[in-house]
Swiss-Prot record:
Quaternary state and interactors: Part of the 50S ribosomal subunit. Contacts protein L32.
UniProt GO cellular component terms: cytosolic large ribosomal subunit
Source domain of life: Bacteria
Family: Belongs to the bacterial ribosomal protein bL17 family.
The protein's name: Large ribosomal subunit protein bL17
Keywords per UniProt: Ribonucleoprotein, Ribosomal protein
PROSITE patterns given in the database record: RIBOSOMAL_L17
Example GO BP: translation
GO molecular function: structural constituent of ribosome
Entry annotated with the keyword Transferase: no
Organism: Chlamydia muridarum (strain MoPn / Nigg)
Gene this chain is encoded by: rplQ
Keyword Protease on entry: no
Length: 142
């Protein structure tokens, strides 16, 4: 019997939470460091560590699970991406593809000898407007 199961609750609907976590995960993998609030970072740390562990398996099934969890869209472009491609800039063409590649190629090999604990949270000063605890979540430089 599990009493008081932890749930990610930040005052949004479940679909909004799911999309927000997927977007934050993509940003964290792409930039390897993001600034956010402490409750979001604590939840993101759980998911980021699971994604790196999944990437270390390096199987087709693991890639498909990662694509699903990150909500990667291969065949659609956002308005911004479409404008950049039309202007001739192909560097921003479907960033999600590069995120999956970086997860499985760069991060999985970097943490191949490590068994968990791939991220760290550094606390910052509180935000001025609403006094929310800010922090930086980043992958270790192992």
């Amino acid at each position: 019997m599990q009493h008081a199961r932890k749930k990610f609750r930040v005052g949004r609907t479940s679909s909004h939470n799911r999309c927000m976590l997927a977007n934050m995960l993509k940003s964290l993998i792409h930039n390897e460091r993001i600034e956010t609030t402490l409750p979001k970072a604590k939840e993101l740390r759980r998911h980021a560590d699971k994604m790196v562990t999944l990437a270390k398996k390096n199987t087709l099934a693991a890639r498909r699970l990662a694509v699903g969890r990150l909500m990667v869209r291969y065949n659609t472009l956002t308005g911004k991406e479409a404008r950049q491609v039309k202007a001739g800039d192909l560097s921003a063409y479907n960033v999600d593809r590069r995120v999956i590649g970086k997860l499985f190629d760069v991060l999985a090999t970097r943490f191949s000898s490590r068994n968990g604990g791939y991220t760290r949270i550094l606390k910052l000063q509180n935000r001025v407007g609403d006094n929310a605890q800010k922090c930086i979540i980043e992958f270790l430089a192992d």
